[in-house]
Amino acid sequence: MSLDMQEWREETTAIVNELLADGSNPDLEYEIEHHFACQDFDLLEKAAVDLFKAGFEVTDAEEMELDDGATIFCFDATTECKLDIETIVADIAKMLPILEKYGVDYDGWGTYFQE
């Protein structure tokens, strides 16, 4: 898990610029899905509760098996906003201390193309 905000800023800038270059509509609100994973369900659940308290919508946790047979638990926290780099980076900055507190990995964010 990288907690370097400069890396997340660069990745966010690249994603937003690619979506806009592909013709995604800059005037619409987008559902931004932030992805999280942890091998310890209890810690993941605590992080989800704290993210909810911080104002994010959270999805139910899912169990996944990795290629090596290990089990991890995952969930998303969602927000709605325009494709605004500063807004998305501010949300990441708000989330990272919560994730660090519980040892939960931040696996980046995504959204869908909109015309």
UniProtKB/Swiss-Prot annotation:
Name any one GO molecular function. endoribonuclease inhibitor activity
Q: Where in the cell is it found?
A: Cytoplasm
Q: Which GO terms describe its cellular component?
A: cytoplasm
rRNA-binding found in the keyword field = no
Q: Tell me the InterPro entries matching this sequence.
A: RraB, RraB-like_sf, RraB_dom
Record's keyword terms, sorted: Cytoplasm
Q: What does this protein do?
A: Globally modulates RNA abundance by binding to RNase E (Rne) and regulating its endonucleolytic activity. Can modulate Rne action in a substrate-dependent manner by altering the composition of the degradosome.
Subunit note: Interacts with the C-terminal region of Rne.
In the record, the note on similarity to other proteins reads: Belongs to the RraB family.
What name does this protein carry? Regulator of ribonuclease activity B
| Species for this entry | Aeromonas hydrophila subsp. hydrophila (strain ATCC 7966 / DSM 30187 / BCRC 13018 / CCUG 14551 / JCM 1027 / KCTC 2358 / NCIMB 9240 / NCTC 8049)
Q: Which gene encodes it?
A: rraB
